Amino acid sequence: MPGPSLSLALVLSAMGALLRPGTPREEVFSTSALPREQATGSGALIFQQAWDWPLSSLWLPGSPLDPLCLVTLHGSGNGSRAPLRVVGVLSSYEQAFLEAVRRTHWGLSDLTTFAVCPAGNGQPVLPHLQRLQAWLGEPGGRWLVVLHLEEVTWEPTPLLRFQEPPPGGASPPELALLVVYPGPGLEVTVTGAGLPGTQSLCLTADSDFLALVVDHPEGAWRRPGLALTLRRRGNGALLSTAQLQALLFGADSRCFTRKTPALLLLLPARSSAPMPAHGRLDLVPFPQPRASPEPEEAPPSADPFLETLTRLVRALAGPPARASPPRLALDPGALAGFPQGQVNLSDPAALERLLDGEEPLLLLLPPTAATTGVPATPQGPKSPLWAAGLARRVAAELQAVAAELRALPGLPPAAPPLLARLLALCPGNPDSPGGPLRALLLLKALQGLRAEWRGRERSGSARAQRSAGAAAADGPCALRELSVDLRAERSVLIPETYQANNCQGACGWPQSDRNPRYGNHVVLLLKMQARGATLARPPCCVPTAYTGKLLISLSEERISAHHVPNMVATECGCR
């Protein structure tokens, strides 16, 4: 190999990255799209489980996998059997609102329920409520999107920002209503950038709901949010922050919480609608995880040897992972002061060191450059005889590594044919400049693949052979303290952390007297292990008794306390 061969250094360095195991990318599901508690109601709407939609990239509206609920109305006042298509979390507050709209006859008492002022005061919300009532009776394929409040700002002007709708949910709706569950309030007027003019509200002690017409709903989920200006009817005085909070967030005395507003969007019918439920609730299933995209095939190489080698590496190590760019903490000043010189991989010492080890990368610095800073003169092969001996050594080691690789258990079926083809293509034409490089490259690649496959075997056997020897340094099997952080479990309010304990230590014969309740089975296993017998699953130190723990959790609408069993380990033993 004449002259400095930096190309080989680059190839071998790349092989180190190429031989690292990689796995295809996996799509990650959002964990929030889970079924919630069944909502109970006393009216005529059948509301069962409420659902969140998953990540917007995981489903398309109108497809067979829409995460929607089909809700069927029943009762004497409704003859329709068509289901309601609802997307989003339908809490008991929205259920009560829709029940009230469905039952109302728009008399004076009904108008009071919705804080609608008497006729003649210009109420744009009344026609919209009547259209919503018509949809509840005859949905006609239209579907309702429920968006809940995400953020509120009080100063200087109240700003309400809601959830962003799912894909397709932001299309122009037939109607958009801001539904508020008010507390005690006064007669007020409401204006805002997303509202069609001034809307009047006449709140009384009998008002349960407050609805506002929104003509530009897209501003409700975009920053800064939906701006509202509330003034007293008559004198036009602005409401204070305390009055606004009491009006817009009514108290829920049953659950000791506040009722948050919701934005309802009624969207037009789509061509692909699910079949009617015929009196039953159907849930269109959530989308299954998408299969990971197939790895991009490398472009065909002009060299069949390199193309076959790439296929073998991917067959054994898996497709290359899309790793983030490496970040090296290098000091430019230190690098500038480092001795500069040529790296010569044709140097006899370099080649011998490369063959003596199995690492695909070798970093060399000539001794003269390290001491004096003067670059060393590149040295060529010692003699043709030495070069021939080195070639024979490469060929012998190549055949030995290939034989070991073929004998490894669990090898993919595609690997042996690819390996045979590589050996047939190597060393190729000995007179060509790439002949020696090809043999050396294949040797280092096969050594790396062999090391990786052996590492997989060792990790697998280590998982299966969790024996007493590995835990001997920790003493005999005994109960150890372990604190568990529950703050990641968002539904658990109290406690934030608790002492769960864990079991750790060696399982050997004779057993420790810390847990006298032995089983005959584990005694026999421990005696076999003491006699030197190999067990596929040696006895492990595990909890044998538990106690419960009182947890205070937050469900959709209430705070509850539960005594959860098997939360704290109290005894340990070998099993």
From Swiss-Prot:
Reported tissue expression: Expressed in fetal testis and adult ovaries.
Subcellular location: Secreted
Propeptide, chain numbering: 25-466
Positions bearing carbohydrate: 78, 344
Name used for this protein in its record: Muellerian-inhibiting factor
Name of encoding gene: AMH
Gene Ontology MF terms in the entry: growth factor activity; type II transforming growth factor beta receptor binding
Protein's UniProt keywords contain Methyltransferase: no
Swiss-Prot/TrEMBL site (Cleavage) positions: 466-467
InterPro entries in the cross-refs: AMH_N, Cystine-knot_cytokine, Muellerian-inhibiting_factor, TGF-b_C, TGFb_CS
Matching SUPFAM superfamilies: Cystine-knot cytokines (SSF57501)
Protein task: Plays an important role in several reproductive functions. Induces Muellerian duct regression during male fetal sexual differentiation and plays a role in Leydig cell differentiation and function. In female acts as a negative regulator of the primordial to primary follicle transition and decreases FSH sensitivity of growing follicles. AMH signals by binding to a specific type-II receptor, AMHR2, that heterodimerizes with type-I receptors (ACVR1 and BMPR1A), and recruiting SMAD proteins that are translocated to the nucleus to regulate target gene expression.
Organism listed in the record: Bos taurus
Key words, A-Z: Differentiation, Disulfide bond, Glycoprotein, Gonadal differentiation, Growth factor, Secreted, Signal
